[in-house]
Design a protein with these regions (language model features):
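C-terminal motif of bacterial Sec signal peptides marking the signal peptidase cleavage site
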Residues: 18-21
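Low-complexity, acidic Ser/Thr/Pro/Gly-rich terminal tails and inter-domain linkers that flank the onset
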Residues: 35-82, 86
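Short beta-strand elements
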Residues: 204-226
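Extended, solvent-exposed segments with strong compositional bias
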Residues: 127-177
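Short, solvent-exposed beta-strand/turn "edge" segments of beta-rich domains on protein surfaces
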Residues: 73-86, 97-102, 182-188
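Extended low-complexity, serine/threonine- and proline-enriched intrinsically disordered segments
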Residues: 100-139
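Internal, hydrophobic beta-strand segments that form the core of beta-sheet-rich folds
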Residues: 160-206
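Bacterial signal peptide processing site
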Residues: 23-25
Length: 226
């Protein structure tokens, strides 16, 4: 009887070891500095991305804008779903605006969702932000050709989002388990970043204020297409 108990325990330990060996390792993370490090200079990871041109019209006058989206260079063509990441979102004037205009950013909405050929997964939202900037002293943040407004968007891992996990497994399913990078990439080809910038244009001559929006949709591939 004692021998049977030992044999059962060994079998159970073997099963645990096999399961542990099959578990997918955590995805690669951003560079982190050890808190015990004596290094004082912080080295930012190289960022790469895309710039987009926009034109808004106020009282028949055109204003040129440039939006910019950058991510860690290592993830440029290898978007990672299961590790938090940061996308730098920014906007500025591309050309000088009329002198009587003060242009400010008053709101930024952004979200990241899955891009997939399967309707069940396509559009499933990973994370989002909605920033009301009207509480700033001037009712927003001024931008010019030399001064942009930049907002780092810290995108949470899909495994930090309970709604995403339920959506991936099916809302009516009772199955709940953390998702692996391998499984998500098997059913998707990347992520889509959508942004809406709300701008306030103040005419200092007439004392009127106008509101305009510009939006972008940016595809971030998670692997090269075969």
């Amino acid at each position: 009887m004692h021998f049977k108990k030992i044999a059962f325990a060994l079998t159970a330990l073997t099963a645990v070891a096999i399961l542990a060996g099959c578990e997918e390792e955590a995805s690669k993370t951003m560079h982190a500095v050890n808190i015990n490090s004596t290094e004082k200079t912080v080295q930012e990871s190289p960022k790469k991305g895309i710039d987009r041109d926009h034109t808004i019209t106020v009282n028949g006058q055109e204003i040129q804008l440039e939006t910019s989206y950058k991510v860690d260079e290592r993830n440029l063509n290898d978007y990672v779903f299961t590790t938090p990441s940061i996308a730098d979102l920014s906007v500025k004037l591309k050309n000088d605006a009329p002198q009587n205009y003060n242009i400010r950013v008053t709101n930024l909405y952004a979200d990241v969702s899955v891009s997939s050929k399967y309707s069940r997964f396509n559009g499933l939202r990973q994370d989002s932000i909605n920033l009301n900037l009207t509480q700033a002293p001037n009712g927003g943040y001024d931008i010019s050709t030399t001064d942009d407004y930049t907002q780092p968007f810290q995108i949470e891992s899909v495994n930090q989002n309970e709604s995403f996990i339920h959506g991936w497994n099916g809302y009516i399913s009772e199955h709940y388990s953390y998702l692996t990078e391998r499984d998500i990439k098997k059913h998707s080809n990347g992520a889509v970043l959508r942004t809406v910038w709300t701008l306030s244009i103040e005419d200092t001559q007439t004392r009127k204020t106008y509101s305009k929006t510009v939006s972008d949709t940016i595809f971030m591939p998670s692997h090269n297409e075969e």
